[in-house]
Amino acid sequence: MNPEYDYLFKLLLIGDSGVGKSCLLLRFADDTYTESYISTIGVDFKIRTVELDGKVIKLQIWDTAGQERFRTITSSYYRGAHGIIVVYDVTDQESFNNVKQWLAEIDRYASENVNKLLVGNKSDLTGKKVVDYQAAKAFADEIGIPFLETSAKNATNVEQAFMTMAAEIKNRMASQPVPPKPGGPVVRPTEGKPINNKSSSCC
Protein backbone atom coordinates (compact mmCIF):
# COMPACT_ATOMS: atom_id res chain seq x y z
CA MET A 1 0.00 0.00 0.00
CA ASN A 2 1.27 3.45 -0.89
CA PRO A 3 1.55 5.42 2.38
CA GLU A 4 0.96 8.73 0.61
CA TYR A 5 -2.64 8.18 -0.49
CA ASP A 6 -5.55 5.74 -0.33
CA TYR A 7 -6.96 6.31 -3.81
CA LEU A 8 -5.78 7.63 -7.15
CA PHE A 9 -8.57 9.04 -9.33
CA LYS A 10 -8.04 10.13 -12.91
CA LEU A 11 -10.27 13.03 -13.96
CA LEU A 12 -10.73 14.50 -17.42
CA LEU A 13 -11.75 18.05 -18.35
CA ILE A 14 -13.51 18.32 -21.71
CA GLY A 15 -15.48 20.99 -23.54
CA ASP A 16 -15.18 23.54 -26.31
CA SER A 17 -11.99 25.53 -26.75
CA GLY A 18 -11.98 28.75 -24.72
CA VAL A 19 -14.51 27.75 -22.04
CA GLY A 20 -11.85 27.92 -19.31
CA LYS A 21 -10.84 24.30 -18.71
CA SER A 22 -7.18 25.15 -18.19
CA CYS A 23 -8.08 28.07 -15.92
CA LEU A 24 -10.25 25.80 -13.77
CA LEU A 25 -7.38 23.35 -13.47
CA LEU A 26 -4.88 26.11 -12.62
CA ARG A 27 -7.21 27.49 -9.96
CA PHE A 28 -7.82 24.09 -8.35
CA ALA A 29 -4.28 22.70 -8.56
CA ASP A 30 -2.19 25.85 -8.04
CA ASP A 31 -4.73 28.45 -6.83
CA THR A 32 -3.66 30.81 -9.61
CA TYR A 33 -5.42 32.56 -12.47
CA THR A 34 -4.23 34.19 -15.66
CA GLU A 35 -6.20 36.09 -18.29
CA SER A 36 -3.74 35.19 -21.04
CA TYR A 37 -3.63 31.41 -20.78
CA ILE A 38 -2.47 29.80 -24.03
CA SER A 39 -4.75 27.21 -25.65
CA THR A 40 -3.92 23.67 -24.61
CA ILE A 41 -2.19 21.65 -27.30
CA GLY A 42 -3.15 18.00 -27.00
CA VAL A 43 -3.30 17.22 -23.29
CA ASP A 44 -1.76 18.49 -20.06
CA PHE A 45 -2.25 17.34 -16.50
CA LYS A 46 -1.81 18.44 -12.92
CA ILE A 47 -2.05 16.65 -9.61
CA ARG A 48 -3.56 17.62 -6.29
CA THR A 49 -4.03 15.50 -3.20
CA VAL A 50 -7.19 16.06 -1.14
CA GLU A 51 -8.77 14.52 1.94
CA LEU A 52 -12.31 13.19 1.85
CA ASP A 53 -14.08 11.31 4.65
CA GLY A 54 -10.76 10.56 6.30
CA LYS A 55 -9.25 9.14 3.09
CA VAL A 56 -6.39 10.70 1.17
CA ILE A 57 -7.21 10.93 -2.53
CA LYS A 58 -4.72 11.86 -5.22
CA LEU A 59 -6.47 13.51 -8.15
CA GLN A 60 -4.70 13.28 -11.49
CA ILE A 61 -6.55 15.82 -13.64
CA TRP A 62 -6.13 15.79 -17.40
CA ASP A 63 -6.85 18.98 -19.34
CA THR A 64 -7.74 18.31 -22.97
CA ALA A 65 -7.67 20.56 -26.02
CA GLY A 66 -11.13 21.56 -27.22
CA GLN A 67 -10.16 22.02 -30.86
CA GLU A 68 -11.42 19.46 -33.36
CA ARG A 69 -7.92 18.74 -34.70
CA PHE A 70 -6.85 17.31 -31.33
CA ARG A 71 -9.95 15.13 -30.92
CA THR A 72 -8.23 11.90 -31.96
CA ILE A 73 -5.44 12.49 -29.43
CA THR A 74 -7.73 13.33 -26.54
CA SER A 75 -10.25 10.53 -27.16
CA SER A 76 -7.68 7.95 -26.04
CA TYR A 77 -7.66 9.54 -22.58
CA TYR A 78 -11.35 8.86 -21.97
CA ARG A 79 -10.97 5.14 -21.39
CA GLY A 80 -9.00 5.22 -18.15
CA ALA A 81 -10.88 8.14 -16.60
CA HIS A 82 -12.86 7.62 -13.40
CA GLY A 83 -14.62 10.97 -13.75
CA ILE A 84 -15.20 13.41 -16.62
CA ILE A 85 -16.05 17.08 -16.14
CA VAL A 86 -17.85 18.67 -19.10
CA VAL A 87 -17.27 22.43 -19.14
CA TYR A 88 -19.15 25.13 -21.03
CA ASP A 89 -18.97 28.94 -20.93
CA VAL A 90 -22.08 30.63 -19.47
CA THR A 91 -21.49 33.57 -21.85
CA ASP A 92 -21.36 31.33 -24.94
CA GLN A 93 -24.60 29.60 -25.95
CA GLU A 94 -22.88 27.46 -28.57
CA SER A 95 -20.53 25.96 -25.99
CA PHE A 96 -23.59 24.86 -24.01
CA ASN A 97 -25.33 23.53 -27.11
CA ASN A 98 -22.22 21.44 -27.81
CA VAL A 99 -22.40 19.75 -24.39
CA LYS A 100 -24.56 17.04 -25.96
CA GLN A 101 -21.79 16.29 -28.46
CA TRP A 102 -19.25 16.03 -25.65
CA LEU A 103 -21.54 13.68 -23.75
CA ALA A 104 -21.79 11.57 -26.91
CA GLU A 105 -17.97 11.43 -26.96
CA ILE A 106 -18.06 10.12 -23.39
CA ASP A 107 -20.57 7.44 -24.37
CA ARG A 108 -18.38 6.48 -27.30
CA TYR A 109 -14.97 6.36 -25.62
CA ALA A 110 -15.28 6.23 -21.83
CA SER A 111 -16.02 3.38 -19.46
CA GLU A 112 -19.71 2.63 -19.08
CA ASN A 113 -19.99 3.67 -15.42
CA VAL A 114 -17.74 6.75 -15.53
CA ASN A 115 -18.90 9.63 -13.32
CA LYS A 116 -19.88 12.86 -15.06
CA LEU A 117 -20.23 16.46 -13.90
CA LEU A 118 -21.54 19.47 -15.83
CA VAL A 119 -19.84 22.80 -15.13
CA GLY A 120 -20.86 26.24 -16.40
CA ASN A 121 -17.72 28.37 -16.12
CA LYS A 122 -17.20 32.18 -16.12
CA SER A 123 -20.12 32.81 -13.74
CA ASP A 124 -18.42 36.08 -12.71
CA LEU A 125 -19.39 37.61 -16.09
CA THR A 126 -22.98 38.22 -14.99
CA GLY A 127 -23.61 40.99 -17.53
CA LYS A 128 -22.64 38.74 -20.45
CA LYS A 129 -24.38 35.58 -19.27
CA VAL A 130 -26.61 33.94 -21.89
CA VAL A 131 -27.03 30.38 -20.58
CA ASP A 132 -29.70 30.34 -17.88
CA TYR A 133 -28.79 28.49 -14.67
CA GLN A 134 -32.20 26.82 -14.40
CA ALA A 135 -32.08 25.59 -18.01
CA ALA A 136 -28.65 24.06 -17.48
CA LYS A 137 -29.72 22.56 -14.15
CA ALA A 138 -32.83 21.04 -15.73
CA PHE A 139 -30.69 19.52 -18.49
CA ALA A 140 -28.25 18.04 -15.96
CA ASP A 141 -31.12 16.68 -13.84
CA GLU A 142 -32.67 15.11 -16.92
CA ILE A 143 -29.53 13.09 -17.66
CA GLY A 144 -28.85 12.46 -13.98
CA ILE A 145 -25.54 14.24 -13.41
CA PRO A 146 -24.50 16.94 -10.90
CA PHE A 147 -24.25 20.56 -12.09
CA LEU A 148 -22.39 23.61 -10.83
CA GLU A 149 -21.64 27.09 -12.08
CA THR A 150 -18.05 28.14 -11.45
CA SER A 151 -15.67 31.04 -11.88
CA ALA A 152 -12.00 30.22 -12.29
CA LYS A 153 -11.32 33.96 -12.05
CA ASN A 154 -12.73 34.49 -8.54
CA ALA A 155 -12.57 30.81 -7.49
CA THR A 156 -16.34 30.42 -7.03
CA ASN A 157 -17.29 26.73 -6.71
CA VAL A 158 -14.02 25.52 -8.27
CA GLU A 159 -13.01 23.58 -5.18
CA GLN A 160 -16.56 22.30 -4.81
CA ALA A 161 -16.68 21.06 -8.42
CA PHE A 162 -13.60 18.86 -8.10
CA MET A 163 -14.51 17.68 -4.60
CA THR A 164 -18.04 16.82 -5.80
CA MET A 165 -16.51 14.68 -8.53
CA ALA A 166 -14.10 12.99 -6.10
CA ALA A 167 -16.98 12.21 -3.72
CA GLU A 168 -19.15 10.82 -6.53
CA ILE A 169 -16.37 8.47 -7.66
CA LYS A 170 -15.56 7.40 -4.11
CA ASN A 171 -19.23 6.64 -3.39
CA ARG A 172 -19.53 4.65 -6.61
CA MET A 173 -16.46 2.60 -5.73
CA ALA A 174 -17.78 1.97 -2.22
CA SER A 175 -21.05 0.61 -3.60
CA GLN A 176 -19.28 -1.65 -6.10
CA PRO A 177 -18.08 -4.79 -4.33
CA VAL A 178 -17.81 -6.59 -7.66
CA PRO A 179 -14.40 -6.14 -9.33
CA PRO A 180 -14.51 -4.02 -12.49
CA LYS A 181 -14.49 -5.73 -15.86
CA PRO A 182 -11.11 -6.29 -17.51
CA GLY A 183 -9.98 -3.15 -19.25
CA GLY A 184 -12.09 -0.88 -17.06
CA PRO A 185 -10.65 1.63 -14.60
CA VAL A 186 -9.27 0.08 -11.45
CA VAL A 187 -9.16 2.12 -8.28
CA ARG A 188 -6.94 0.75 -5.58
CA PRO A 189 -4.16 1.94 -3.34
CA THR A 190 -1.74 2.19 -6.21
CA GLU A 191 1.66 0.66 -6.61
CA GLY A 192 4.64 2.35 -8.16
CA LYS A 193 6.66 5.44 -7.52
CA PRO A 194 5.00 8.54 -6.05
CA ILE A 195 4.37 11.23 -8.61
CA ASN A 196 6.40 14.39 -8.23
CA ASN A 197 4.05 17.23 -7.32
CA LYS A 198 6.53 20.00 -8.04
CA SER A 199 6.41 19.73 -11.80
CA SER A 200 3.41 18.10 -13.35
CA SER A 201 3.01 20.21 -16.47
CA CYS A 202 3.75 18.64 -19.84
CA CYS A 203 5.26 21.75 -21.29
Curated annotation (Swiss-Prot):
GO CC, sorted alphabetically, is: plasma membrane
Functional summary from the UniProt entry: Protein transport. Probably involved in vesicular traffic.
- Key words, A-Z: Cell membrane, GTP-binding, Lipoprotein, Membrane, Nucleotide-binding, Prenylation, Protein transport, Transport
Question: What gene makes this protein?
Answer: YPTV1
Membrane-related topology note:
Lipid-anchor
Coarse class of the primary localization is membrane
What are the start and end residues of every segment in region (Disordered)? 173-203
Which is a GO BP term held by this UniProt record? protein transport
Family stated for the protein in its record: Belongs to the small GTPase superfamily. Rab family.
Instruction: Supply the source organism for this entry.
Output: Volvox carteri (Green alga)
Protein name (database record) = GTP-binding protein yptV1
What residue intervals hold the motif Effector region? 37-45
Q: Where is the lipid attached (S-geranylgeranyl cysteine)?
A: C202, C203
Which residues are GTP-binding?
15-23, 33-40, 63-67, 121-124, 151-153
Q: Which GO terms describe its molecular function?
A: GTP binding; GTPase activity
Q: Which domain of life is it from?
A: Eukaryota
Q: Where in the cell is it found?
A: Cell membrane
**Pfam families (alphabetical):** Ras (PF00071)
Q: Does the keyword Protein transport apply?
A: yes
